[in-house]
Each structure stands twice: as structure tokens, then as C-alpha cells.
From Swiss-Prot:
Protein name: Probable dual-specificity RNA methyltransferase RlmN
Domain Radical SAM core, residue spans: 113-346
Free-text function comment from the UniProt entry: Specifically methylates position 2 of adenine 2503 in 23S rRNA and position 2 of adenine 37 in tRNAs. Confers resistance to some classes of antibiotics.
Note on how the cofactor is bound: Binds 1 [4Fe-4S] cluster. The cluster is coordinated with 3 cysteines and an exchangeable S-adenosyl-L-methionine.
Pfam families, per database record: Radical_SAM (PF04055), RlmN_N (PF21016)
Gene: rlmN
S-S bridge residues: C120-C351
Enzyme Commission designation: 2.1.1.192
């Protein structure tokens, strides 16, 4: 729930007349009802309408009194996302470009796997981290999303899956933006979708990825929630990582590893390192050896990413043979590594690419 204190702390939050009803955690809904002279058991009914029956309006909540429905309408908005573009890949991946109520656009991706349907959500409109391989940073950061706007991405995809009796089984927070720069809203989102009264998506089926905002890694280590944790690494040495990710100049590799070790000491959970392979930059066997040396004492997994070509950036794809050699070298050195299956390569599946294309059209 967005309070005055939250708005003061997070200057990039929107200033809507009404906040999204999807921004309230279950405990916040209970307290809000009590504060407004209602019985807190109504929270269970409201969450059932929102997340199980997935209604589009408060008026459809027919087991609530007209008085309570009116109170809810007076205070909250039912966040809706308008689908501007929907691209479907031959492998079943679907990329959505959604328009928010203030006209900004965000991306959400549905990925189909043998083990279920995974949704990749966005946490910010744009991004200010400045990764040199990512289209998301091209327009800078416009604003943060409310928790309810992040929840609505999952719900909108789930409603589409309802037509074929499928469900969202996994969530990855790897879309546009840096989740740890919108930390409180991200954490509210996690607690909402993980709640038994909501979408009930298991914590171990949710992954959050950061570019390495070190203060928030320490905060995340203290959270009582077993969410999977991934770090975008892309380079084992400062020279290469700073070239790819300018954030490394503020939070270098040594400091990042120190924070990750603290996280593991506190949680005893495995960390995934995302390592995008960029032709001629970080994809040689010497780079694999540097990576293995850096993380050899950690409980971790390396996810090797054959990077989609992004026309807005100048990096090229690493040849398949070199990708396999890189993986083989890591395994030889005792590192658990896999190559991410390419999905959506025939659509604008690189992060921020579809949004960037639409922005070009708008400004012509």
C-alpha cells in the first residue's frame, strides 16, 4: 500500500488520485477494512474476487454490501493495462506491450516451458542503470511502478491463460528496470503474489534479478521470504563489467561478491549468476576461467545467455560453438552452468526492444 511516507521515500512513484487495489497486501487490506469500520474477514472475500475469480470491476463483488463496494470504489482503482502490441513467437513466447493509465508503456513476456508458464515482469518505466547492451536504458527512467501495476501484469497474462485453462506457474522479475531501485514496491508485489489468498505462487517459483545494487542486497538478505535470487554479472573483472554495466563503477566486483557472500551466510540459499555472452568481449575461455575463479567458493549456478542481437546496440552474438566451449570450461573447473534456451528470437524479445521500437514510431 502506498503511504505518504512511501511517496516521500520513493520520489519516482506516480501520484495518481486513487491507488491500485492490487497494491494492498492481504494484511494491509484487513487493516484498511478495520480502519474504515468494516469486518476484516471481508479481506478474504475481496481477494477471492480479485485473484481467484479475477473480476474487472468492484461492482462484480456481489457478496459485498453496496455500501462497502462504494467505499472501495471511492478509495481504490482497479488497475487495468491496455494491450498496445502483442507479439507471438513460433516457440510460443508472447510479448506484450502494455499502456499504463498515464500513457507510459511497459513490457511483459510470457514464456512457455515443459514445466509450466513463466511470466517476466517489469518494475520501472525505463531504467537508469545504463547497461550498454540493453534497450531498456535508451530513454532513461521515467518512473517506478506501483506494486499493483506489477501485479496487474501477472493478472492480465493469467486472464489470457484462463481461456485455455492454463495458469502462471513461475514469475521472473527480469523485465524493464532495476527491481532493487523500486525495492518496497517490489517486495509488496512479491508478498502479494506469494500469498495463499492471492495467486499463491510459491516463493521458490519466483526469481528476482538485480544488476548489483549492493545496499539492497543486504536488505534482501534480511527478508523472511525464500525467493530465488539472481545477479546480472556478465563480467568477472572490473574492466569488462564496467564496460558492459556502468553500475560496476559504483559497486565493483569485489564489493558485489562481499554482499553476495553475506546474503548466502544469512539465507543459505543458492545464487544464480546471469552471464550474457557478447562476441569478442567476454566470451573467451580466459573469461570462463576468470569467472570460475571469482565464484568457486559460492553455492551458485551460472546461467549462460546467448544474447539476442539488439539493433540499438552494437554487440554481436557469440557463435554457438564458442558458447558450448565456454560452458564446458566452466564445468571442467567445477562450476554448475547451463545455457539458457533461446526464446522469442523471432520477435522483439530483448528487454526494452519492443518499447523502444514503439517510442521510435511515436516520435517520427
Amino acid at each position: 500500500m502506498i503511504t505518504a511516507e512511501k511517496k516521500k521515500k520513493n520520489k519516482f512513484l506516480p501520484n495518481f488520485e486513487k491507488q491500485s487495489i492490487y497494491s494492498l497486501r492481504y494484511d494491509e487490506m484487513q487493516q484498511w477494512l478495520i480502519d474504515h469500520g468494516q469486518q476484516k474477514f471481508r479481506a478474504k472475500q475481496i481477494f477471492e474476487w480479485l485473484y481467484q475469480k479475477r473480476v474487472n470491476t468492484i461492482d462484480e463483488m456481489t457478496n459485498l454490501s453496496k455500501e462497502l463496494r462504494q467505499i472501495l470504489k471511492d478509495h481504490f482503482a482497479m488497475t487495468t493495462l491496455t494491450t498496445v502490441v502483442k507479439q507471438e513467437s513460433k516457440d510460443g513466447t508472447i510479448k506484450f506491450l502494455f499502456e499504463l493509465q498515464d500513457g507510459y508503456t511497459i513490457e511483459t513476456v510470457l514464456m512457455r516451458h515443459e514445466y509450466g508458464n513463466s511470466v517476466c515482469v517489469t518494475t520501472q518505466v525505463g531504467c537508469r542503470i545504463g547497461c550498454t547492451f540493453c534497450a531498456s536504458t535508451l530513454g532513461g527512467l521515467k518512473r517506478n511502478l506501483e506494486a499493483g501495476e506489477i501485479v496487474s501484469q501477472v493478472l492480465t497474462v493469467q486472464k489470457a491463460l484462463d481461456e485455455t485453462n492454463e495458469r502462471v506457474s513461475q514469475i521472473v522479475i527480469m523485465g524493464i528496470g532495476e527491481p532493487f531501485e523500486n525495492y518496497d514496491e517490489m517486495m509488496d508485489f512479491l508478498r502479494i503474489v506469494n500469498d495463499d489468498n492471492s495467486l499463491n505462487i510459491g516463493a521458490r517459483h519466483i526469481t528476482v534479478s538485480t544488476s548489483g545494487i549492493i545496499p539492497r542486497i543486504y536488505d534482501f538478505a534480511e527478508e523472511d521470504i525464500q525467493i530465488n535470487f539472481a545477479v546480472s554479472l556478465h563480467g568477472a573483472k572490473d574492466e569488462i563489467r564496467s564496460r558492459l554495466m556502468p553500475i560496476n563503477r559504483a559497486y565493483n566486483v569485489d564489493k558485489l561478491m562481499e554482499a553476495i557472500r553475506y546474503y548466502q551466510e544469512k539465507t543459505n540459499r543458492r545464487v544464480t549468476f546471469e552471464y550474457g555472452l557478447f562476441g569478442g568481449v567476454n566470451d573467451q575461455l580466459e573469461h570462463a576461467r576468470d569467472l570460475a575463479h571469482l565464484i568457486k567458493d559460492l553455492n551458485c549456478h551460472v546461467n549462460l545467455i546467448p544474447v539476442n542481437h539488439v539493433p540499438e546496440r552494437n554487440y554481436v552474438k557469440t557463435p554457438k560453438d564458442d558458447i558450448f566451449k565456454f560452458e564446458k570450461e566452466l564445468k571442467r573447473l567445477g562450476i554448475n552452468a547451463t545455457i539458457r534456451r533461446e526464446q522469442g528470437s523471432d520477435i522483439d524479445a530483448a528487454c526494452g526492444q519492443l518499447r523502444a521500437k514503439e517510442r521510435q514510431v511515436e516520435t517520427r
